[in-house]
């Protein structure tokens, strides 16, 4: 018999009810309509974070009912992967923002991609936002204002594409100013702004207002403690704002996580114009078929997990063990709680556990992780950097994922881990609240402190010593709905709420 969970948790039959209730939901989408999905990165071409994964997946999740087209800057990496690009339109100069051609390609699955072409602004080495040396490009304000203004021009039908979207879907600060450009020019195209991380706001000095083509009487809409914020301008002017989890949408209306925009966001929420939708994960993350795994497994056949665990231990120089294996797949930064993990590592090792770490980040935390590997050889291993195949094998072989993030707008690693039967141990914040069912599909602790994490680890060790409970939780985690079909249905409703999009089809060229 399963032990009762702690007071305030679910009753002891919660796992059975969870597994019986959660099944894949059918997607029921409306007639095809035109949506321009504006983004600064897309995993098909170039990726700096989770936004790139969303941009690759969400338009495709809606494509079979919506005429979704993506607009992305023509970075060097994009052009290298795009192949032949057809020039189909042009946006004119605006203030100091240069004129740009618009190229078009169609992905193999039929998804149209518009590429904003400017050798001066986008064809350079580095990520979308920083150079190869790690410093931000000095002209980022011009670069992403140009992207935003191009989106507004396309919405107005001024780009010569023979197509006008019924809705602009804008993502994070690099695209947020498009909502302002639409409104400032008298446009009426509905705008949805998705905030993937409120901490990045696109701050620029007031002196740039003229160069960016912001009307003098509208500059106040961007005001942020003596600077201008692209993101604030988007929040003010968008018809609706959403975040990438329900809990994060609530948390950013308060000062603790509102990043100075909490009062504005609370005002939008009070008017019903701020909501949350949890991201999905790609269907290719399937332990039965994953191309990165030598040993596959399923909810009914577990042997492959043991094989993957052995491979992970070998890859990280860990000795053979029957104890629990803890994975860390994360940027090694303070925000992700890596300092907390370093503090509790001795407790994990003393209790018979092992730790495998993959990621890179702040030099001080990298040094702390390296010191742990020296202090506990064969028990703690680390790979500074990132290699996707190794990360997937870690999810497929580890028993637990350590994810004590101080804040987390959504988070993807916990959902990847669950899909592979690896139980998250996570701080109860943002999307982690919405995706980890405490005691059912993982473990949550309420305060980002060493002591709270230690108590949560004790629960995980107790669970590991109860094979029946461990197997039931793994099965519940693997069966948890986390695909883009679920999120797609919610974006369908949000598009219709935002735009009341007319049933007429967009003109397809």
UniProtKB/Swiss-Prot annotation:
InterPro entries: Glyco_trans_1 (IPR001296), GS/SS (IPR011835), Starch_synth_cat_dom (IPR013534)
SUPFAM superfamilies linked: UDP-Glycosyltransferase/glycogen phosphorylase (SSF53756)
Binding, ADP-alpha-D-glucose: 47
Protein's UniProt keywords contain DNA damage: no
Reactions catalysed: [(1->4)-alpha-D-glucosyl](n) + ADP-alpha-D-glucose = [(1->4)-alpha-D-glucosyl](n+1) + ADP + H(+)
Known pathway: Glycan biosynthesis; glycogen biosynthesis
Alphabetic keyword roster: Glycogen biosynthesis, Glycosyltransferase, Transferase
Top enzyme category: transferase
EC number: 2.4.1.21
A Pfam family this chain is assigned to: Glycos_transf_1
Gene Ontology MF terms: alpha-1,4-glucan glucosyltransferase (ADP-glucose donor) activity; alpha-1,4-glucan glucosyltransferase (UDP-glucose donor) activity
GO biological process: glycogen biosynthetic process
CDD domains found in the cross-reference section: GT5_Glycogen_synthase_DULL1-like
Matching HAMAP family: Glycogen_synth
Protein task: Synthesizes alpha-1,4-glucan chains using ADP-glucose.
Similarity comment text for this entry: Belongs to the glycosyltransferase 1 family. Bacterial/plant glycogen synthase subfamily.
Protein name: Glycogen synthase
Organism: Xanthomonas oryzae pv. oryzae (strain KACC10331 / KXO85)
